Amino acid sequence: MNQTVKVKKKKKTITLGVVHIRASFNNTIVTFTDIQGNTISSASAGGNGFKGARKATPYAAQVTIDRASAKAKEHGLKTISIRIGGPGAQRESAMRALFGQNFVVTSILDVSSIAHNGVRPPKRRRV
């Protein structure tokens, strides 16, 4: 009788981490990492059941932060540094949702890339 025994993987306890928030025009992606950049947890508005234009709403960003931070708290994350990027309207509500999660925030950094006359912007929308 050969039985295979599955060993449960130990969860690492990480107390200090970085939150990367990418707020684009179409979606919000949140990633919790440790200091070295190894992913602890991640979530996106599209992965949380929001489809189409609803992915780019501030409420979708709030739900995304809640889901990702719940996973990160299981690993013992308490102190975070925030790196937020992108042109989306969800930035402010994502920050407020993070402050409501009882993390100790050490720094907030805006890592949005600024084009120095880069690619041509999309044409104007006609409704």
Swiss-Prot record:
Gene Ontology biological process terms in this record: translation
GO CC field: ribonucleoprotein complex; ribosome
A GO molecular-function descriptor: rRNA binding
Keywords attached to this entry: Ribonucleoprotein, Ribosomal protein, RNA-binding, rRNA-binding
Keyword Ribonucleoprotein: yes
Highest taxon in the source lineage: Bacteria
Protein purpose: Located on the platform of the 30S subunit, it bridges several disparate RNA helices of the 16S rRNA. Forms part of the Shine-Dalgarno cleft in the 70S ribosome.
NCBIfam families: PRK05309.1 (NF003698), uS11_bact (TIGR03632)
Similarity field: Belongs to the universal ribosomal protein uS11 family.
Complexes and interactors: Part of the 30S ribosomal subunit. Interacts with proteins S7 and S18. Binds to IF-3.
Protein name: Small ribosomal subunit protein uS11
Gene source species: Rickettsia akari (strain Hartford)
Highest classification ranks of the organism: Bacteria, Pseudomonadati, Pseudomonadota, Alphaproteobacteria, Rickettsiales
